[in-house]
Amino acid sequence: MPEVILSAQELVKHYPIKKGVLRRTAGQVKAVDGVSFDLHKGETLGIVGESGCGKSTLGRLLMRLEEPTAGKVIFEGADWSSASGREMRRMRRDIQIVFQDPYTSLNPRTTVGDIIGEPFEIHKDVVPKGGRRRRVQELLDLVGLNPEHINRYPHQFSGGQRQRIGIARGIALNPMVLVCDEPVSALDVSVQAQVVNLMEKLQDELGLAYVFIAHDLSVVRHISDRVGVMYLGRMAELGEEDEVYSRPTHPYTQALLSAVPVPDPTLRGKRDQIVLVGDVPSPANPPSGCRFHTRCWKAQELCSQEEPQLEMRADGAGEHLSACHFAEPRTIVETVDVSDLEPDARFVATDLRDDALAADAPVDLDQMAERSGQLHGDAGYAPQEVTRLIDEQPGDHRPSDG
């Protein structure tokens, strides 16, 4: 096991609720309430959960962009949460952040060269080899952008390109840890894949460790080595990616995974989807005991009286922790061999995998189109428009010829 580079110890962040003319404190929003975990060198720790569970606040606490109400952040053996301003400046070279929204995290009045080169202005004792401009061009090339675009402004780039600029800024000082606060949630799916693949490439080349915060379970599974699941400011489950996704032990994790669409139609009927009842309680007034007991189908009297601890379960593999009094593994979707099964009658009409295709014979596209009764085309080909011309009576959509 690689050495621990970053450790969160019982992190707490409560925001006061002010009311009245005198702005007196009338309560607290418990955004993060006792979260602990370790991050090892070169690994990716994924943090998932519903909106409002405290994921982004946790990321800001790790960066000390928010001062914790209680708890510690230990970075390379030093207490980050109590460091002085001078010590923080030195330590921030080694831990950087990529923000969620690429449209608001970049200054629209500043060129890309100045945005990526800004860390060298703050840390003047860090002099890049070959000069600042050359280093910025190297970073642009490293993240897959044209170095000649160094003098362009953010509005001249797409969303995916802007996020690449944010990543280039984050790795400018060669950090050891990169906190990624939902870096792909504002991007299209195809662009998400490009950014995630870029981050994996940079991790291999630079030896980075990621804290990857997201709400997309598929993206987190693709990139993470370990996964932590948060609910109402607390960690519900933490373990190796394979264990958490294939054998989740916490009811909340099981419910989340049961809602993920199954691409194989032959397996959809083999999974029981768990439907949670009720709404997420307010973090200003969380339930007593286990915070999930108001929506949990396993809840008993003990759950409302005693808060479960995040503990290792005897039947789990490796370091698989779960905060549940009645934690037990549950297989969400079984992976079964369906090669000998009869195809589902609903899909027979469109199943084109015949013996000729299985034998790698030449494919007759006209025959496939005739059998399927469908029209196919790339973007811009407009098969829907062709279908409409065939089905509708002559009128406004009459073809120009043919």
Q: Which positions does each model-derived feature cover?
A:
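Short catalytic/signature loops enriched in Gly
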Residues: P2-V4, I17-R23, Q28, E240-R353
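ABC ATPase NBD coupling module
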Residues: V21-A26, W80-Q96, D114, I122, ...
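Helix-to-loop junction immediately C-terminal to a conserved catalytic motif
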Residues: M63
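Conserved ABC transporter NBD signature motif
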Residues: G71-D79
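Conserved ABC ATPase "signature" region
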Residues: D79, G130-E148, L257-S258
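Conserved ABC ATPase signature
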Residues: Y153-F157, Q161
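P-loop NTP-binding/switch modules centered on Walker-like glycine-rich loops
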Residues: M176-V179, P183-L187, V191-G269
